[in-house]
Amino acid sequence: MKFFAAKLEEGVKGGNGKPSVGPVYRNLLSEKGFPPMDSDITTAWDVFSKSVEKFPYNKVLGWRRIVDEKVGPYMWKTYKEAYGEVLQIGSAIRALGAEPGCRVGIYGVNCPQWIIAMEMTHEDVYLSFLPLAHILDRMNEEYFFRKGASVGYYHGDLNVLRDDIQELKPTYLAGVPRVFERIHEGIQKALQELNPRRRFIFNALYQHKLSWLNRGYSHSKASPMADFIAFRKIRDKLGGRIRLLVSGGAPLSCEIEEFLRVTCCCFVVQGYGLTETLGGTALGFPDEMCMLGTVGIPAVYNEIRLEEVAEMGYDPLGEIQAGEICIRGTCLFSGYYKNPELTQEVMKNGWFHTGDIGEIHPNRVLKIIDRKKNLIKLSQGEYVALENLENIYGQNSVVQDIWVYGDSFKSMLVAVIVPNPETVNRWAKDLGFTKPFEELCSLSELHDEHIILELKSTAEKNKLRKFEYIKAVTVETKPFDVERDLVTATLKNRRNNLLKYYQSANVPLYRYKSTKCTENCR
């Protein structure tokens, strides 16, 4: 078997109140020790100022003006222009009394003015749409500035992100799984509108290219014919220049990752990291199909091991190594601001305890299962990983948004679902219903029959255990949004807020006959 990471230490069995810990793994490139760091680059300012010297007239920050409710073309600042603004902002902060080394909090949306204030191959272009406080976006921007490359910001509306993509034509796109799920849904919708013959040809080309990818060929060499006939059109929808897609923030399903690898004509990988680990803790390999559904191996300056979570049955020394992911290395944070108690809680003997549950496969590749806090115990004593189930059920075309809920005093799971309007309208047309979408969502034929059967089909396809099946659904017509604080800025469910929201509206989530969310719930 091919190993992708080096094993430095064997696991240790727990005892006397101490949990078992698994083997310690490191990147093969740093098996003999972490490589030396660049002594000239110690801060974000160093990253930026060095690039100003090398690439003063390269485009660095791009944005789109909105005039009379119309979004214009991208406008750009050069490295030299941005440098001048950095000095002005730094001078203004000093004038307010801040001294070198002080902590300065900055609240900002994705725009050139804020990335300048935050100190931030020269031909690459990155589209920034994740919040600047999100480590995935911040890490990518810092890296682009190091290379003298360009960063363009979305114009503020994620629902029409495709318009920014077409205008900017990025070479690199990083996002959370929900973004790539929407790309997948859009492609699937277009496929359904093809005539049967063209759809058959597409599927045949898909399987042909996939077979060569599985034999070890790179995405560019697996089937140039299939790329030319069918898949280049999908690449064009991503701007036509895309070279790399990276998903992070939560697990992306194997099915969607495989689909993107086959059809997008570019490298597609998943990564893993946290703010506390400065972002890139682990990253997959683009042309290794055995890494589908995983986040790859430790980055060069990190070590990873798993720690036992006995009450949940996760054993890092078991046949399948599983447990809480712990990280050690030179890229860890120094501590939480004004919170030494929490710092002490997560940092133990040099290991940062992430709160994430992972598996390490026999080839030493890491897979994320869920967050410890997203694991709940049902009344019969079974633990359920809620976020993992949402990722699985969210693959079904009938689902636009889903929140899976389990009460510890109940033996089954329920869910609130926002159906995909296009899928629902197709279903209604086939059955002869002519009602608007909101009225269709109140039909028992939809929520008590069609949606439940679709979810059951997805559960069977993914070999879920019976207690992981959704037994009842509440249908909501309005997508979960940031405005109601139901999701984070990266579109992750805020579980406590969702529960409070529906409880305050007196929506009975546990019921065998489900109905549409009441009007006072909006």
Descriptions of predicted regions:
Residues 331-333, 346-347, 365-394, 403, ...:
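Adenylate-forming
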Residues 36, 57-118:
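Conserved AMP-binding/adenylate-forming core of the ANL superfamily
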Residues 121, 133-152, 166-167, 171:
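Conserved short alpha-helical elements in the N-terminal third of ANL/AMP-binding
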Residues 357, 362, 396-423, 459-462:
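C-terminal boundary motif of the adenylate-forming
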Residues 4-15, 39-64, 84-87, 463, ...:
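A short N-terminal helical cap/helix-turn-helix that marks the beginning
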Residues 171-174, 184-290, 399:
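Gly/Ser/Thr-rich phosphate-binding loop
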Residues 376, 401-403, 450-522:
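Conserved C-terminal "lid"/linker of ANL adenylate-forming enzymes
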Residues 312-378, 518:
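Conserved ATP-binding/catalytic segment of the ANL
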